[in-house]
Amino acid sequence: MAKAKISPVANTGAKPPYTFRTGWALLLLAVNFLVAAYYFHIIQ
């Protein structure tokens, strides 16, 4: 029996929006550093 290729993600051939996910990653990283700076009393 041949196995059918079943994927939960639609195979449309479109490129993933790397700019979108990179923007969110950089935003979350910036917020993370802001919280860390506040925690270590670098900013008041």
Swiss-Prot record:
InterPro entries linked to this entry: PSI_PsaX, PSI_PsaX_sf
A single BP term in Gene Ontology: photosynthesis
Main subcellular location of this protein, as a coarse class: membrane
Keyword Transmembrane: yes
Transmembrane residue ranges: 23-43
Compartmental location: Cellular thylakoid membrane
UniProt keyword terms in alphabetical order: Membrane, Photosynthesis, Photosystem I, Thylakoid, Transmembrane, Transmembrane helix
Gene Ontology CC: photosystem I; plasma membrane-derived thylakoid membrane
Membrane topology: Single-pass membrane protein
Family statement drawn from the similarity comment of this UniProt entry: Belongs to the PsaX family.
Quaternary structure (record): The cyanobacterial PSI reaction center is composed of one copy each of PsaA,B,C,D,E,F,I,J,K,L,M and X, and forms dimeric and tetrameric complexes.
Protein name: Photosystem I 4.8 kDa protein
Record organism: Nostoc sp. (strain PCC 7120 / SAG 25.82 / UTEX 2576)
